[in-house]
Amino acid sequence: MKSIPGDIPQYLLIKAQLQERIQSGALKSGDKLPSERELCAIFNTTRITIRESLAQLESSGLIWRADRRGWFVTPERLWLDPTQNTNFHKLCREQGREPKTALLSGVLTTVPVEVMESLQLQPFDQIYLLTRLRYADGRAVCYCENHCLPARVPELLQYDLNGSLTEVYESHYNLVYTSMHLSFYPTAMPAQAAQALGVMEGRPALLLRRLNYDQHGRVLDLDIEYWRHDSLRIEVDTH
């Protein structure tokens, strides 16, 4: 890394130049950056310096890395209003994005201790545990664990769960999400979520924990979601 005592390090100067290109619109959402080798030639520097610059931009949420494909300008964040009861697929479509949900696993298992109280269950009660990956415009943005109650949705695993769980509940069980308790806070990406999303374990993430109720006021399920730190923003209008 080239720098002169008292001067700004070269990796920060390169970061600033790339950031200016992104914020000015010269590089647009979804655009692919030149390869690391090409950037080395453009800025007449080493690959180590370029990687430091790219890491800084990634931490700022301006670019993201696709495995074996390179670096891309980060798409605009999805925005979520917690006061609006909407599902992921509807949220994406309302914002001009193409949603996709992929079921990674679905099992009947003993309720995890950390969600037992929220679901009003006893030790060794059973739940359906779904792990799913959510995409916006082909980019994996959210790793989700759905904890579903067999008493509300018996034989859930027989249905196609590669889509909206809301629609499955409505069409097969006549159950509708009507209210929820939502908490969200920054956290470190756990190993299983990191592997599914293609990011490093321990990277910044936004955790959403959503306890959902049906039209009869009963607990319906509990979702735990790990979002890429650069993919979601929370907005609330109190007017």
From Swiss-Prot:
Q: Which GO terms describe its molecular function?
A: DNA binding; DNA-binding transcription factor activity
A Pfam family this chain is assigned to: GntR
Alphabetized PROSITE patterns for the sequence: HTH_GNTR
SMART domains assigned to the protein according to its UniProt record, in alphabetical order: HTH_GNTR, UTRA
Q: Which SUPFAM superfamilies match?
A: Chorismate lyase-like, Winged helix' DNA-binding domain
Task: Outline the extent of the HTH gntR-type domain.
Answer: 8-76
Gene3D superfamilies for the chain = Chorismate lyase-like, Winged helix-like DNA-binding domain superfamily/Winged helix DNA-binding domain
Q: What is this protein called?
A: Putative transcriptional regulator of 2-aminoethylphosphonate degradation operons
Q: Name one GO biological process term.
A: negative regulation of DNA-templated transcription
What domain of life? Bacteria
Xref: InterPro entries: Bact_HTH_transcr_reg, Chorismate_lyase_/UTRA_dom_sf, Tscrpt_reg_HTH_GntR, Tscrpt_reg_PhnR, UTRA, WH-like_DNA-bd_sf, WH_DNA-bd_sf
Q: Gene encoding this polypeptide?
A: phnR
Query: At which residues is the DNA-binding region annotated?
Result: 36-55
Task: Give the UniProt keywords, A-Z.
Answer: DNA-binding, Transcription, Transcription regulation
